[in-house]
Amino acid sequence: MVLGGCPVSYLLLCGQAALLLGNLLLLHCVSRSHSFNATAELDLTPSGAAHLEGPAASSWEYSDPNSPVILCSYLPDEFVDCDAPVDHVGNATASQELGYGCLKFGGQAYSDVQHTAVQCRALEGIECASPRTFLRENKPCIKYTGHYFITTLLYSFFLGCFGVDRFCLGHTGTAVGKLLTLGGLGIWWFVDLILLITGGLMPSDGSNWCTVY
């Protein structure tokens, strides 16, 4: 069949070629657009936060309270690493000069335990607004040195006459006296049992009982 001097099959072939060329051009444009968007996303930083280059590449300068990036000091405990409380060993002057730290450790009731600030830092790979190192307040002045209440109570009950419980807790002087008197003929042994149960006999280094989970 001939239409206007041109075979219909020839016209259809030209149309298919034009469609194929159009599809190729469209695919090329889409590919270039996708590549540009991917590059732009790498350069973007959250609104209100300027990205820092160098070692602190996962930090931003905090400038906008509406930014999705929070200050590092607002991170939950599981995303930060904190130092142990500073022990000033009763030196009040050193505590005042530094501005934080513990004068004493330990305590049974909450009101007996001192609280202080400690140095914390955001974990590697956590993105937050700088500074990445900060002070976190209200940390209890307690430490653990491997003393377990149940173990010490068993020592006191079965071997208390020989002062094993006090040796274990670091009270060496009174432990020797308890050993030489065989637990004060049983009186000292009984008194130490009561003191352990009521919290009157604790480790000599001011540490708390380790918790058994």
Curated annotation (Swiss-Prot):
Residues 23-143, 203-213 are extracellular. Glycans are attached at residues 37, 91. It is a multi-pass membrane protein. Its main location: membrane. It comes from the Eukaryota. It is found in: Membrane. The keyword Membrane applies. Residues 165-181 are cytoplasmic. GO terms for cellular component: membrane. Residues 146-194 form the TM2 domain. InterPro entries: TM2 (IPR007829), TM2D1-3-like (IPR050932). Keywords: Glycoprotein, Membrane, Signal, Transmembrane, Transmembrane helix. Residues 1-22 form the signal peptide. The chain crosses the membrane at residues 144-164, 182-202. Belongs to the TM2 family. This is TM2 domain-containing protein 2. It comes from Mus musculus. The gene is Tm2d2.
